[in-house]
């Protein structure tokens, strides 16, 4: 985290939240975030508040996502799960729209009135915690899974129609996008991408894409480890879920599969080879089964194994398509000569992970069943 000058926060945003930063000893710290521009404001902020998080929302998210976040976090709070809460601006609204011609207080209504969408800012309460990007500690992963299980369980009875609807996982669409990319003039000329993309599509022929026997549940949408906070004094204990812009309804297989993909790949996304660690599956599903509602069917939890292969192959297809189309993913110019090169490495890594899961499918399925069967009676 890096201290930044106070004038980097637009005056209209400071006014909207009653922040007299130029007249106080408050510090503004730039926090690591891949999507939204995020700042931690610390000091005497009035009304007994010592810290808040200010964020400028990435345009990929609509401002109405805050209606969903408010509904979910209010429900979590009522269920006594710790969660960051949105802080309303001086006009009583959940977000603030700001541009050079905006009302200094900012208003939700300004979003609809402006021809060019203004910047969207929000404030939220600050939950102190440790951010972890990778872990090899089974107890830490089990605790993370327990938190995810409590999170899902608390939202089982949430009656809310999501306003900001984005498909959490649309594997068929991503595979079709790869087919089209391979068939394009640029794709046909790229032998390396052709070979990799064709292999991905071949394995995808055996994927399970239909989970409609299970209900669509309220999911986080991006359960990577860095979207969980851990207690600083007890790093093995998960504290709360953060980064809630991806909330929505979907199948548990995808959510748990994505968590396993992220948590169980020891080499990370920038390696061409990957092997799924079976110990991660046992720790994660055992922890999840301990904390989720007893009524959650074992078959639905065990669908995580199929979801793991599906999500890994889906991401491989997205990276491979972008290596040809070059339209979505960012890349590391300090480590790779081009966006295409970086995306090919990432595609190979996710495909390698999907192959590893496919090879171990029978063993993984057995481990999943054993983990779920061991959950205590409640």
Where are these regions (language model features)?
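ATP-dependent phospho-/nucleotidyl transfer catalytic cores
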Residues: 29-32, 55-64, 104-113, 130-142, ...
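Active-site activation/catalytic loop segments of kinase-like enzymes and analogous catalytic loops
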Residues: 253-294, 310-331
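Juxta-kinase regulatory segment immediately upstream of eukaryotic protein kinase catalytic domains
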Residues: 1-27
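Conserved ATP-binding subdomain of kinase catalytic cores across diverse folds
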Residues: 29, 34-39, 44, 49-51, ...
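ATP/Mg2+ or Mg2+-diphosphate-binding catalytic cores
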Residues: 182, 314-378
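Small/polar glycine-rich anion-binding or flexible loop at a beta-alpha turn
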Residues: 301-311
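Short secondary-structure junctions
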Residues: 15-24, 78-82, 211, 294-295
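Catalytic activation segment of kinase domains across protein kinase-like and atypical kinase folds
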Residues: 226-265
């Amino acid at each position: 985290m890096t201290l930044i000058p106070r004038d980097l926060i637009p005056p209209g945003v400071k006014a909207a939240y009653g922040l007299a930063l130029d007249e106080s000893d408050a510090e503004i710290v730039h926090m690591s975030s891949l999507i939204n521009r995020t700042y931690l404001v610390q000091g005497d902020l009035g009304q007994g508040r010592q810290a808040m998080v200010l964020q400028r929302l990435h345009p990929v998210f609509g401002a109405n996502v805050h209606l969903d976040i408010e509904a979910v976090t209010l429900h979590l709070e009522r269920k006594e799960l710790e969660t960051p809460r949105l802080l309303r601006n001086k006009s009583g609204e959940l977000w603030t729209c700001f541009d050079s011609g905006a009302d200094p207080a900012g208003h939700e209504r300004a979003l609809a009135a402006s021809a060019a969408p203004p910047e969207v800012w929000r404030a939220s309460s600050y939950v102190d915690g440790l951010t972890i990007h990778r872990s090899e500690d089974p107890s830490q992963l089990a605790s993370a899974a327990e938190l995810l299980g409590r999170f899902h369980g608390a939202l089982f009875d949430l009656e809310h129609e999501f306003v900001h609807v984005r498909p959490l996982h649309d594997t068929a669409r991503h595979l079709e996008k790869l087919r089209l990319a391979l068939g394009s003039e640029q794709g046909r000329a790229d032998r390396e991408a052709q070979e990799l993309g064709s292999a991905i599509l071949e394995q995808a022929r055996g994927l399970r894409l239909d989970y409609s026997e299970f209900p669509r549940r309220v999911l986080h949408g991006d359960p990577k480890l860095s979207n969980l906070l851990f207690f600083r004094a007890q790093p093995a204990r998960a504290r709360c879920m953060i980064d809630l812009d991806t909330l929505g309804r979907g199948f548990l297989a995808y959510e748990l599969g994505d968590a396993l993909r992220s948590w169980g790949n020891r080499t990370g996304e920038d390696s061409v080879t990957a092997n799924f660690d079976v110990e991660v599956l046992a720790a994660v599903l055992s922890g999840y089964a301990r904390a989720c509602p007893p009524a959650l069917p074992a078959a639905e939890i065990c669908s995580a194994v199929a979801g793991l292969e599906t999500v890994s192959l889906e991401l491989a297809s997205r990276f491979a398509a972008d290596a040809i189309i070059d339209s979505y993913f960012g890349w590391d110019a300090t480590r790779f000569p081009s966006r295409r090169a970086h995306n090919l490495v990432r595609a190979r890594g996710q495909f390698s992970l999907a192959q590893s899961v496919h090879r171990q499918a029978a063993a993984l399925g057995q481990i999943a069943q054993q983990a779920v069967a061991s959950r205590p009676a409640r």
